[in-house]
A protein has these predicted regions:
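Hot-dog-fold acyl-thioester-processing enzymes
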Residues: 2-57, 112-129
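HotDog/MaoC-like acyl-thioester-processing domains
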Residues: 3-7, 11-13, 68-72, 80-129
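Conserved interaction-surface patches within small, structured recognition/assembly domains
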Residues: 56-66, 74-79
Length: 129
């Protein structure tokens, strides 16, 4: 565990990133990380409502360090808040390098907002039936 992290995190996704995920610099493309953040945060949001959820905002994304091919990357989520129709999720992204598999490096953090919707795509209360 990374120093300073809370134990209230939920491991939503863990992946090993591959050469197909790289950018022109040979590190993992930020868009790949963003996509996985969105998936991980959606898993957390769905833990708090029976409705479908859609992404409405990525309020803040901070890339702290690059991710390399072969890194084991974990996406930890934490519920930040629940509004009437919205759910805000914080995501911490941690990489474990091949040369130091027991050391987690915080590589990215983000805050993502979802809205609960019905089958027609209309907003519905998170806790409603």
């Amino acid at each position: 565990m990374i120093l300073g992290m809370n134990d209230d995190r939920f491991l939503a996704i863990r992946v090993m990133l591959l050469p197909k995920d790289t950018n022109a610099h040979g590190t993992i493309f930020g868009g790949v990380i963003l996509s996985q953040i969105d998936l991980a945060a959606a898993v957390e949001a769905r833990r708090h409502t029976r409705h479908r959820v859609v992404t409405v905002a990525m309020r803040e994304v901070v890339f702290h360090a690059p991710v390399h091919v072969g890194d084991i990357v974990s996406f930890y989520t934490r519920l930040a808040s629940i509004g009437r129709t919205s759910i805000t999720v914080e995501v911490d992204v941690e990489a474990r390098r091949a040369d130091q598999p027991d050391v987690g490096v915080k590589v990215t953090e983000a805050t993502v907002v979802y809205v609960a919707v019905d089958d027609a795509g209309n907003k519905v209360p998170v806790k409603g039936s």
